[in-house]
Design a protein with these regions (language model features):
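Alpha-helical secondary-structure segments
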Residues: 117-127, 165-171, 211, 242-244, ...
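N-terminal lobe/hinge region of extracytoplasmic solute-binding protein
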Residues: 47-97, 207
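Detector for C-terminal structural segments
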Residues: 19, 323-350, 394-405, 427-543
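Structural transition elements
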Residues: 338-375, 392-397
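Ligand-site clamp/hinge motif
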Residues: 206, 233-278, 293
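Surface-exposed binding/hinge segments that line
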Residues: 94, 139-193
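A structural "hinge/loop" feature
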Residues: 48-67, 89, 115, 178-190, ...
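Gly/Pro-rich hinge or "lid" segments in bacterial periplasmic/extracellular proteins
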Residues: 176-239, 244
Length: 543
């Protein structure tokens, strides 16, 4: 299958001279999007997972909550199906030096409760997300802004200034020309003034400014469904072509697949293992299987017995060599995954299969045994190597396959450790209560190599689930982010990966395709660069 690179459009096109964000239009829908006839009041349904946390943009960093936030809020920019950047709430984003940015907001925009979408709505939300005391999972995304600190609470970042109702400025600690490219991620979304009256209540019943809104108070029925309706007040480029979205929170993808077959679900955004060989014939002409900016990994925290220091590095390398990725992607996934060659994704600009050290991802049972024996010489292994995973997703098949390979190739006991739901799985991880290795992965927030590295492996980053820290790696990330030339930045990010290949804070497994299927009653179904279906453009026939 042809691989389409997602270029760092923002980085390549920022030069000195007060240029507006390249690739952003002042308004309107990108030409690549099509409108289709259908009942504008018809409600579509899609499967989803229970969000891990209350629905606050700066504290949502997983896919279940992310799909809801993305649907209910509008940021300064958004990404189309190919990952190109377009203005949404922003009228312009300008800079002379890639360090200080002036952001102007389109006038007359409101949240669904009538609060204005103004400069304060962004600055207050960003300050909250960045402050140490608030412990927001996405705080890392504000690290570049002047005044941010991991060591002390900073209620108001010195790099954020409100100029007037519709204008604010952002000053970074150093020039970072891809900064505007990040601004479509949920962490940078605005929040209404009313949210701060009772943030706990807001998390259960969020008020946004995007294409959709909660159908009513209490529309989030936990572990059952989240019902959204079209937000008629939203006038941006993502205007919904349907009457709303019912997000059904399934306990398993097999159940969701059965509902799609039975006509009780419109869009399925994940295919269960049991249907990988049949889904394209079951829904002929109504499926997607395409490369996307997502990957799968196993994280083995250094705090676990036998996985710290030199012993831990040797054991991670041994486990990586003991995994036959080709066999699993062919047999378990029926060719719908691609064995990993790096820590990012083939559709991200800068991807390379030739980074020194990447040979640790090659299957080599003899080398695996050798490395494991070297680790045993430091401290003999005992017990069972377990891999925690969420049972409500299609994970058991590949986890069992890896466990069997580790048994055969390392001579150890290995097994999966199922957790009922994705939300419970993530909570154990984020609260550092996971006592084993665990299934992990990354769905890119914005199309940049930095996003596949910094938020996951940078020291103190919000999605650094294994608490990895390496000063040399952090320095290379900073150098790459501040590089004036795109290619220079990519080289630094590739050098940073050399360190990851040596220490393996996570073990890359494979790249995840965007896979899904849909029913006969919906049209204009398209899955984006980030694996998500683009819900606002879906149309549905009248029932």
């Amino acid at each position: 299958m042809k691989r389409n690179k997602i270029a760092l459009a923002g980085t390549a096109l920022f030069v000195i001279g007060a240029l507006a964000l390249a690739g952003c239009a002042a308004g309107g829908t990108p030409e690549t999007e099509e409108t289709s006839s259908g009942d504008p009041t018809a409600v579509i349904s899609v499967n989803n997972t229970e969000p891990q946390n209350p629905l606050i943009p700066t504290n949502t960093n997983e896919v279940g909550g992310g799909l809801v936030i993305q649907s209910m809020f509008a940021g300064l920019v958004y990404y189309d199906a190919e990952g190109a950047v377009h203005n949404d709430v922003a009228e312009s984003i300008e800079t002379d030096d890639a360090q200080t940015f002036t952001i102007k907001i389109k006038p007359d925009q409101t949240f669904t409760n009538g609060d204005p979408v103004d400069a304060e709505a962004f600055v207050t939300a960003w300050n909250y997300g960045a402050a140490l005391d608030n412990a927001q999972l996405s705080s890392y995304f504000f690290e570049s802004i002047e005044g941010f600190s991991y060591d002390e609470n900073v209620p108001e970042l010195s790099g954020l200034k409100v100029v007037d109702d519709l204008t604010f400025t952002v000053k970074l600690k150093q020039p970072e020309s891809d900064f505007p490219l990040r601004l479509g991620y949920t962490a940078y979304f605005p929040m209404p003034a009313s949210a701060w009256d009772d943030l706990e209540a807001f998390g259960e019943n969020p008020v946004g400014n995007g294409p959709y809104a909660f159908e009513e108070e209490g529309a989030w029925k936990h572990n059952e469904r989240i019902d959204l309706v079209k937000n008629d007040e939203y006038t941006g480029p993502r205007e919904a072509q349907n009457g709303g979205v019912d997000m059904i929170l399934y306990a398993s993808t097999d159940a969701a697949y059965a509902d799609l077959q039975g006509g009780n679900l419109d869009i399925l955004q994940e295919i269960p293992d049991s249907a990988l060989q049949t889904f394209e014939s079951d829904f002929e002409g109504r499926t997607v299987n395409q490369p996307a900016a997502a990957n799968a990994t196993i994280t083995i925290p250094g705090r676990l017995d036998h996985f710290s220091g030199e012993e831990g590095i040797l054991r991670r390398q041994a486990i990586s060599h003991a995994i036959n990725r080709e066999e699993i992607t062919d047999v378990v996934f029926n060719g719908t995954r691609t064995p990993a060659k790096d820590f990012t994704s083939p559709v991200i600009d800068g991807y390379s299969e030739e980074i020194p050290g990447s040979e640790v991802l090659e299957f080599d049972a003899d080398e695996a045994k050798k490395l494991w024996a070297e680790a045993d010489a430091i401290a003999p292994w005992s017990g069972t190597f377990e891999i925690q995973y969420n049972a409500d997703g299609p994970n058991q098949g590949w986890v069992d396959a890896i466990a069997n390979q580790l048994k055969n190739n390392l001579g150890i006991e290995a097994a999966g450790k199922p957790i009922p739901t994705f939300a419970e799985h993530r909570t154990l991880i984020t609260e550092r209560q996971a006592t084993t290795a665990f299934r992990n992965g990354w769905q890119f927030d914005y199309p940049s190599m930095f996003n596949g590295l910094g938020p996951i492996y940078g020291t103190d980053a919000g999605s650094n689930d294994g608490d990895y820290s390496n000063a040399e790696f952090d320095a290379l990330l900073d150098e790459g982010a501040s590089a004036a030339d795109v290619e220079d930045g990519i080289k630094k990010f590739q050098e940073a990966q050399e360190i990851l290949f040596q220490e393996l804070p996570s073990i890359p497994l494979w790249y995840t395709n965007a896979m899904g299927a849909w029913g006969e009653s919906v049209e204009s179904v398209e899955f984006g660069w980030d694996t998500w279906p683009i819900l606002y453009q879906v149309t549905k026939a009248a029932e």
